[in-house]
Amino acid sequence: MLYPEVFGTLEKLRWNMAKDVPWDRFDLALLTDEQATTIKMNAITEWSALPATEMFLRDNRHDSDFSAFMSVWFYEEQKHALVLMEYLRRFRPDLAPTEEELHQVRFEFDPAPPLDTLMLHFCGEMRLTQWYRRAAQWQTEPVIKHIYGLLSGDEARHGGVYFRYMQQAIERQGDEARAAFAKVGVLMTSSARSNKPLHPTNLHVSAEFFPRDTIQSRLPDPDWLEHWLDKQIQFDSSWEAKVVNTILIKLSNLFGQPFEGIKDLNRYRKQFTQPAATAS
């Protein structure tokens, strides 16, 4: 059982919104309307941890250990939304998200295989770690730069916890877990081919609500994410390479063999599909 240790570790590292954010350093002259608007969009996106947690708890009723960790993940992710909203409330109240705008991103996701979802969110945390690092560099106002640094650190730690649950899944479920993690790993490292940001909030999750079944499609500006990444924080190929390399290194450690690139991971993935293909 991982939850007791994970809780203790994250508890020691948890930052305090009142004490660890230098609110008194705010400089209005260093915050543009463009930058403030992206903070609003990030805040609403972070609020989507609510439906994601509902999905995790529904699909992991068999795993009370992981479900208990969701209490920590949900708390910290909702705090991300809250600190961004507090920043806007203090300094740009005209851009603070409304309750209705927040509620728009709460809808029921279709059931999905828990192992696939675990890997999907591990990759999402690795990606968001780098997105927020780049956002901290792009922002010019010192308080929000500091906040994005805090968020990036949290996302990296969350990814580390997901990785530990992935290790546990391999110990317990063997090749079933390896196949799921390799399959989703190939998907989530293939952003160049997909031509869209590969993050859980940008993937279709509900047939009932299609095409408005991604988190991003329910934001006030559904196209903001691509613009934020490409034109604003300029998350270019060098930054994307950091994400892909991190995922490949972690999977190399997880599976006990080196992956120099996505093609290596894809070859590894195919070994789990061959028996089924032969049987058919």
Locations of the language-model features?
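Non-heme di-metal
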Residues: 1-280
